[in-house]
């Protein structure tokens, strides 16, 4: 019923969580019945069972979770897994360099499976203290994220760029221009100094410049509204806000 509702409203696809979440075979059946694709999977354990954890057993479990998400993405005919690669927690045991090194090592372990199944592993920019300065100003750049992706050096790894997440720390349109073809998918939400995370179109994001930047890099991938769900009216509002602010439709 949820797939049917989203299809009727005008959505082009959905994402699921893994490990866990809804039964993937049932979801695939619903996708086929309604014609609404499942375009990807979100790794559901990456915040707690981090690939950057100082504990080797936790990293192993995180890698197992990523591999499960990759398999589930393939099962539901998706194209990618969204991954938060780690989090900077303390200066001694999980600092920026350690998060960098450990996460890249674990991602490399997952890449043979990703390549075999044709599934991208896409890094989301989040408030994890990684690849930006959480105490810095609002003119930070995407240079570190670009460098991180380039060091992984795989056609199966790219950016799942979240437009709203780094409005506080930089200009999303400039991040888009810097990342360029590294961006494979987008997460869409609003953020503003006065209202924090908010509805798409509210807040401080310069949506016209975001649209210009996406056109400049030739972006044609999936864009996901990373916002709270709800009833038909709520989901119609989210859809219409995506159309207006991301696509520039009247």
Describe the role of every protein-language-model region:
Residues 1-7, 77-79, 142-250:
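Histidine-acidic metal/acid-base catalytic patches
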Residues 32-33, 52-161, 166-168:
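Active-site acidic/histidine proton-transfer and metal-coordination neighborhood
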